[in-house]
Structure formats: C-alpha cells, structure tokens
C-alpha cells in the first residue's frame, strides 16, 4: 500500500512538472504564443503609435508560430470577416522591415510561407503573398517562386518577386523558362532587376 501511494505521489509530481515544461511561456509575463496573439488582436487598433509598436513587437517575437496562428484565422470572405487578422499580419510584416528589427524578419517570413502552403482560399493566399512582398528577402524568393505556375497566384507572386531586394537570380531563372505566359515573360523582361 505504501509503495502504491509513493508511486502515485511521484506520478503526480511528474505530471505537474511535465505540464509546466510543455506550457513553455513566451515572455516575462508567462504568456504562451496563443495568448500573445489573442491579446494583440484584442488591443488592435492601438490607441497610440507607441502602443502599436509594442503590440507588433510582441507579435513579431512569437515568430513563425505566432504568424501561423494569425494566418490560420483567415477565413473565406463568405464565411466571416478578416479585417482584424489582416491588420495584425500587415502590421507584423511591416514592423520587421524597420531598421534594428532584422532578427525578427526570417521567422515572420517563415510563418507566412508556411501559412501560404496550408491556406486553401485563393483570396487569402493572395493576401499572404502581398505580406511576403512587404517583408520577404532573397532567401525567401525561391520558395515564393514555386507558386509562379499557380493560376490565381502567378501574377501576385511575380509582383512580389520583383519587389524583393536582391531577388535577381530568381527572376533570371524565371526568365529562362519557356513555359511562362506572355504577360509573365514581359513582366520579368521589363523588371528593373532582370
């Protein structure tokens, strides 16, 4: 009987410890990524520019996971409203492009690319591409170029690639393809980078 009791006590402590480890608090206030995202959405639009920067900084610090959670909240237009989520995603994509925030940018782009791969709604996919147009770097260009043949995303992807700094190599590889549409070929040819 004593052995069973000791075993139960040990199991209780082990479960308690495991629960605390897996909760993985994100910040000094012990908030999880899900909580940070929910808090940010509840506070937007922000009252001041300072509040806005604080909220966007917290969202950007959640990295790919937080961006993915936000992007997964996008719904087809016929099923609901996306304004708050789009506002938050646009804010984060813009926030990480400012000087001094470069370390946050790769994770945000990773989250946007992963969300793009999961998203099934064309309008929401185009929105995610537009956010990548804001914050993607040459490191993301090849992953984005994979969508050039998508009938709905081909043009937005091409516009994004043209906008991404140092994406010339990706654009040149596209220019060499024989299966581009005439409009795509013209856009690549007349791009200042190609």
Please tell me what each predicted stretch does.
Residues 8-20:
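Bacterial N-terminal signal peptides
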Residues 67, 102-106:
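Helix-turn-helix repeat elements of alpha-solenoid scaffolds
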Residues 63-82:
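Short, charge-rich amphipathic alpha-helical segments embedded
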Residues 36-41, 69-74, 111-116, 143-145, ...:
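Buried hydrophobic core positions in alpha-solenoid tandem helical repeats
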Residues 24-30, 50-62, 82-103, 114-118, ...:
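Structural detector for internal amphipathic alpha-helices that build alpha-solenoid repeat scaffolds
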Residues 1-9:
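Bacterial N-terminal signal peptides that target proteins for export
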Residues 24-45:
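Short N-terminal segments immediately surrounding and downstream of signal-peptide cleavage
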Residues 108-109, 180-181:
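HEAT/HEAT-like alpha-solenoid repeats
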């Amino acid at each position: 009987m004593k052995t069973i009791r000791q075993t139960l006590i040990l199991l209780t402590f082990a479960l308690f410890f495991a629960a605390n480890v897996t909760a993985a608090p994100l910040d000094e206030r012990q908030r999880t990524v899900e909580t940070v995202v929910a808090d940010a959405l509840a506070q937007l639009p922000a009252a001041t520019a300072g509040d806005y920067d604080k909220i966007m900084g917290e969202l950007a610090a959640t990295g790919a996971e937080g961006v993915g959670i936000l992007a997964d909240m996008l719904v087809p237009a016929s099923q609901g409203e996306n304004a708050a989520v789009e506002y938050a995603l646009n804010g984060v994509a813009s926030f990480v492009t400012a000087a001094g925030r470069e370390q946050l940018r790769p994770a945000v782009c990773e989250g946007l690319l992963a969300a793009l791969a999961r998203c099934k709604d064309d309008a929401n996919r185009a929105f995610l591409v537009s956010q990548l147009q804001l914050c993607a770097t040459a490191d993301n260009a090849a992953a984005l170029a994979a969508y050039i043949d998508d009938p709905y995303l081909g043009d937005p992807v091409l516009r994004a690639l043209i906008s991404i700094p140092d994406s010339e190599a990706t654009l040149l590889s596209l220019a060499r393809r024989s299966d581009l549409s005439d409009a795509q070929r013209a856009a690549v040819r007349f791009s200042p980078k190609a």
